[in-house]
Amino acid sequence: MATTKEDVLEFISNLSVLELSELVKEFEEKFGVTAQATVVAAGGAAAGGEAAEEQTEFNVVLTDAGAKKINAIKVVRAITGLGLKEAKAAVEETPTVLKEGVSKEEAEEFKKQIEEAGASCELK
């Protein structure tokens, strides 16, 4: 029986974050590509003098776990819903995108929680 796209998607959706990370690395090696998120740099004003649009969706990126990794792991688990093993891997493999496409208010709240735990993050 042939494997369908739905079968592949179902399989991938059941992988842990660590397993997904390993899968991405294998794809990069096999196909000679990189799995980097496309980030558009926000410039000043556009050529026509138009003001740049205010960003409405943000990615929360953990950049450093700080001295107390346990606190960072707890916050990562609370924000992402990951299991202990996956959260620990995310904290140890910084920079790590914790949340994608969240509102400015949510992103600021996550940043506050992360910084209170002694870790550092960026909003992109």
From Swiss-Prot:
InterPro entries: Ribosomal_bL12, Ribosomal_bL12_C, Ribosomal_bL12_C/ClpS-like, Ribosomal_bL12_oligo, Ribosomal_bL12_oligo_N_sf. It comes from the Bacteria. GO terms for biological process: translation. Homodimer. Part of the ribosomal stalk of the 50S ribosomal subunit. Forms a multimeric L10(L12)X complex, where L10 forms an elongated spine to which 2 to 4 L12 dimers bind in a sequential fashion. Binds GTP-bound translation factors. One of its GO terms (cellular component) is cytosolic large ribosomal subunit. The keyword Transcription regulation does not apply. Belongs to the bacterial ribosomal protein bL12 family. Coiled coil: none annotated. Disulfide bonds: none annotated. Forms part of the ribosomal stalk which helps the ribosome interact with GTP-bound translation factors. Is thus essential for accurate translation. This is Large ribosomal subunit protein bL12. It comes from Sulfurovum sp. (strain NBC37-1). Keywords: Ribonucleoprotein, Ribosomal protein. GO terms for molecular function: mRNA binding; structural constituent of ribosome.
